[in-house]
């Protein structure tokens, strides 16, 4: 696990665009909405839209390089766990990308309509859930060599979008925050198990 964490953090630090590109995209989209001078409720919606687009862009390259250079296949052939690999990728993105995105959203919106701690936590859970689902779409696209296969995750996102709207636009934390947390747990387990299953056909007999 430690080795995987060091690898993923090093990959992000050694390629600075992995940090500044998503944060720049997020900030630019957010700035556009601010210039358009929407009211506060639409600012929360713009925060979600900016997050949605940014996480989607990140997910497009999450596994691409490791898949193309054979790193994932090598791990499978060596019998090394993909769970620690997936966990390390999530922790590195959470620490270096999603936490700064949450800070930017907090500084701009302020989450003034409710408790800051709960809204900050909900925002991180929202970003993490998007991360898992978009990664599933990215993995399906790589495995089948067809980006349209990623559309399969859209039905899974519909209930999630409704939950996010009720939390950040309607400001209804209870019981939606609990539902959002349950959706996060579902996405983390279901998606990671699916990713491991998707990778299994690439095994080769030594």
Q: Which ranges hold each PLM region?
A:
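Secretory targeting signals
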Residues: 97, 101-129
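Hydrophobic alpha-helical transmembrane segments of multi-pass membrane transport/permease proteins
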Residues: 15-37, 45-56, 98, 151-163, ...
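Aromatic- and glycine-rich beta-strand/loop motifs that create alpha-glucan
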Residues: 1-22
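Helix-loop-helix units of permease transmembrane domains in multi-pass membrane transporters
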Residues: 62-94
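Transmembrane alpha-helical segments of integral membrane proteins
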Residues: 134-135, 159-169
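A structural motif at transmembrane helix-loop-helix junctions in multipass membrane proteins
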Residues: 122-157
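Single conserved hydrophobic/aromatic residue that forms the stacking wall/gate
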Residues: 196-206
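Selective transmembrane-helix segments that form parts of the transport pathway or gating/packing helices
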Residues: 82-109, 184
């Amino acid at each position: 696990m430690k080795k995987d964490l060091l690898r993923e953090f090093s990959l992000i630090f050694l390629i600075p665009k992995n940090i500044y590109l998503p944060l720049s995209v997020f900030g630019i989209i957010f700035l556009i909405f601010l210039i358009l001078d929407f009211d506060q409720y639409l600012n929360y919606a713009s925060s979600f839209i900016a997050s949605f687009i940014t996480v989607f862009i990140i997910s497009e390259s999450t596994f691409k390089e490791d898949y193309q250079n054979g790193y994932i296949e090598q791990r499978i052939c060596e019998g090394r766990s993909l769970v620690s690999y997936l966990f390390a990728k999530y922790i590195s993105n959470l620490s270096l990308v999603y936490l700064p995105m949450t800070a930017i959203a907090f500084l701009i919106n302020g989450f003034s309509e409710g408790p800051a701690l709960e809204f900050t936590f909900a925002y991180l859970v929202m970003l993490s859930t998007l991360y898992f689902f978009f990664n599933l779409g990215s993995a399906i696209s790589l495995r089948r060599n067809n980006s349209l296969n990623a559309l399969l995750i859209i039905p899974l996102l519909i209930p999630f979008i409704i939950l996010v709207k009720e939390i950040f636009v309607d400001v209804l934390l209870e019981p939606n925050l609990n539902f959002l947390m349950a959706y996060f747990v579902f996405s983390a387990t279901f998606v990671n198990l699916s990713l491991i299953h998707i990778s299994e056909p690439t095994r080769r007999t030594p």
